[in-house]
């Protein structure tokens, strides 16, 4: 029988102790109690923060949204099929971040910044949190530079400035997305970056928009963030915040960016769905009590920031430049009801609205903008000089025409002044029509509006207004290129007005339309 030597035993124990590596890793863990419709109830996670990312088995992540006394309610990001009751999960100590930077331009990404266009991975150099506090009062600057949309009706009557929030509101199929896409196409060559956030739309509709942007060479300066109708409610809820963070990258570096949320009604629906599944008490129209805060904290991040903010943010790399994030949120109404909960909320948050009507759209007036109730609260100070000077009479002419047209249906004999107003209004209405994907320059708008104001249209047949406009613009661009270039800078003077009048008289004499 072999005998054990006590010294050998002590040596073995010493060696074992020396080789033992004790690493203590404290992790805040919890157990999945239930999984229902993308909502997960977790027992434990005592130290979890609101909005913190939670890691589940299989590399799936969620966000903590409900912190209750004995449980945590979390929403899953992506597919929840692999998560089961009894599994463990742990806090990550991080809040949700998305990639930002110029590497994303020309790409289609999901709400987490992952590419979904099949063009390979995105090598973004930086990431940023999706939930950020909006710039304070001191960091802001007043809106005084224009964003040209390229649509006569919008740029003359409801001008939009850099850093403004202008709501596009209307029923389905009234041309809301068309205005937004035209706005993106018109930013080509201006240096304004664009972000198009598609929320809860059909994948085929998003693909169609991307194809149109590519056709018109607008994808190079655009990021598309897509949360389709088949994506979970959590992705539709987060997509606008992700897009906003990508836009803030440019704003805080002294650049200009335009972001379109298409549309926030579907984000509110997704948030309502999440809130009801989390058992939060429902309020008006079953929306949770904080649905106003959902949109206000998102839209307040669209702003014009001053040079001091940009310099501080970039640690002195960018000096003397202001940055801006301009938002065009879209809201879909049901049967023209703008007094519903979400439309009234967003109207009160934004700096004006473009109201689109089904009746006008069906009558062939496109963009189908109601000039009477569409308004821009801050854009007037950002309008270019030439458009501001010339466009004053357009809104009045249209408003008077709508009023008189309703009255003229019942009146049999009208005086000459009323007839003249009706004729003028008819022609201005025709003039405000514009084909999709054909944005106009400042000079082209100025020529058309000047012709309307100075009575050059009164003897042109209403049916021939479209032909008159296209002939006039091709004549001006070919024969008066210098004058057009001067007006494109926004300049306007008596000298320019005189030249413009002479050019229009010469064109009218040719009768070539």
From Swiss-Prot:
First-tier enzyme category under EC: translocase
Membrane topology listed for this record: Peripheral membrane protein
Site (Required for activity): 374
UniProt entry tagged with the keyword Translocase: yes
Reactions catalysed, as given in the entry: ATP + H2O + 4 H(+)(in) = ADP + phosphate + 5 H(+)(out)
Pfam families: ATP-synt_ab, ATP-synt_ab_C, ATP-synt_ab_N
Principal subcellular localization: membrane
GO cellular component: plasma membrane; proton-transporting ATP synthase complex
Subunit-structure text: F-type ATPases have 2 components, CF(1) - the catalytic core - and CF(0) - the membrane proton channel. CF(1) has five subunits: alpha(3), beta(3), gamma(1), delta(1), epsilon(1). CF(0) has three main subunits: a(1), b(2) and c(9-12). The alpha and beta chains form an alternating ring which encloses part of the gamma chain. CF(1) is attached to CF(0) by a central stalk formed by the gamma and epsilon chains, while a peripheral stalk is formed by the delta and b chains.
Function statement: Produces ATP from ADP in the presence of a proton gradient across the membrane. The alpha chain is a regulatory subunit.
Name of this chain's protein: ATP synthase subunit alpha
């Amino acid at each position: 029988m072999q005998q054990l030597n006590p010294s050998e035993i002590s040596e073995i124990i010493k060696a074992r102790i020396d080789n033992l590596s004790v690493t203590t890793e404290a992790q805040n863990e919890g157990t999945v109690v239930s999984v229902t419709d993308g909502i997960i109830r977790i027992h434990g996670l005592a130290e979890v923060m609101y909005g913190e990312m939670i890691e589940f088995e299989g590399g799936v992540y969620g966000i903590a949204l409900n912190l209750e006394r004995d449980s945590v309610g979390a929403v899953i990001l992506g597919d929840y099929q692999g998560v089961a009751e009894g599994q463990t999960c742990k806090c990550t100590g991080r809040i949700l971040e998305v990639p930002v930077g110029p590497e994303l331009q020309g790409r289609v990404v999901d709400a987490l910044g992952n590419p979904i266009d099949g063009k390979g991975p995105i090598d973004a150099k930086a990431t940023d949190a999706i939930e950020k506090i909006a710039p304070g009062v001191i960091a802001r600057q007043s809106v005084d530079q224009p964003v040209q949309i390229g649509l006569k009706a919008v740029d003359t009557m409801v001008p939009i400035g850099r850093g403004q929030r202008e709501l596009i509101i209307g029923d389905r199929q009234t041309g809301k997305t068309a205005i937004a896409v035209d706005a993106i196409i018109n930013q080509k060559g201006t240096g304004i970056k664009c972000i198009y956030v598609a929320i809860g739309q059909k994948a085929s509709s998003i693909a169609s928009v991307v194809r149109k942007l590519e056709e018109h060479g607008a994808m190079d300066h655009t990021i598309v963030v897509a949360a389709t109708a088949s994506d979970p409610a959590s992705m539709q809820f987060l997509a606008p915040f992700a897009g906003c963070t990508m836009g803030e990258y440019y704003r805080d570096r002294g650049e200009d960016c335009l972001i379109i949320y298409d549309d926030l009604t579907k984000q509110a629906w997704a948030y309502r769905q999440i809130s009801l599944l989390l058992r939060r008490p429902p309020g008006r129209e079953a929306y949770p009590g904080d649905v106003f805060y959902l949109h206000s904290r998102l839209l307040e991040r669209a702003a014009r920031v001053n040079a001091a903010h940009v310099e501080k943010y970039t640690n002195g790399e960018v000096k003397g430049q202001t940055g801006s994030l301009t938002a065009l949120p879209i809201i879909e109404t049901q049967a023209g009801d703008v007094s519903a909960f979400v439309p009234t909320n967003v109207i009160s948050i934004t700096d004006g609205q473009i109201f689109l009507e089904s009746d006008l759209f069906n009558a062939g007036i496109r963009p189908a903008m109601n000039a009477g109730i569409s308004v821009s609260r801050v854009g007037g100070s950002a309008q270019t000089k030439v458009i501001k000077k010339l466009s004053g009479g357009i809104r009045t002419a249209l408003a008077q025409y709508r009023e008189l047209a309703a009255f003229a249906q019942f009146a049999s004999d009208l005086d000459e002044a009323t007839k003249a107003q009706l004729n003028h209004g008819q022609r201005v209405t025709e003039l405000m029509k514009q084909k999709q994907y054909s944005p106009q320059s400042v000079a082209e708008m100025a020529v058309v509006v000047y012709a309307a104001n100075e009575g050059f249209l009164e003897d042109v047949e209403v049916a021939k207004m479209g032909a008159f406009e296209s002939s006039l613009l091709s004549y001006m661009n070919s024969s008066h290129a210098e004058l057009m270039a001067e007006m494109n800078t926004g300049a306007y003077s008596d000298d320019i007005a005189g030249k413009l009048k002479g050019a229009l008289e010469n064109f009218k004499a040719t009768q070539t339309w």
